[in-house]
Amino acid sequence: MVAGMRSYLAAAGVDVAEESATGRLVLSSDRDHLIDGCRFDLEGMMRSLEEALKEALHAGFAGLWATGDMTWEVGPDKDFSTLLEYEWRLEEFIRENPQMGGVCQYHIETMPRKFLRQGVVSHPSIFMNQTLSMINPVYRYSDSFASAQSGAPELDSFINRILERQSMAEPQNLT
């Protein structure tokens, strides 16, 4: 994933070596957010993001932007049980810290549909590709974990419509 991002940025005209050397660009595949290198550590990930934002602001940057492949983020155990809570806590953190932004990547070929639904309802906007993004009409604020499980047919229909629109692009990022 990191090599692919490096290549994409270079093709877009970013001097990846220079930006990395100055600290303006950090590409990492570290898995410090995993317990025993296998299970997702929700608390550890939130602390890590809070610390990274503080460091960026302290270094004089206007903010921090992050992205992650959610299947990769949960680790090799593929335990998605805390994914929805993480997404809602992350959204709350971003609301409280407008200097923070990012994109959570949900790739349909690696994410079970149940958790894809959770990803869709937990984000107020959907980024499909460089030219297509939208306000998420099925977004549900974190008032109820149960609400993310209700309406599965509605969510599946919405996800299918998104995938139809995106069928020519590679890979699909739903949130």
Predicted regions and their residues:
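Non-catalytic regulatory/interaction regions at protein termini and inter-domain linkers
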Residues: 1-175
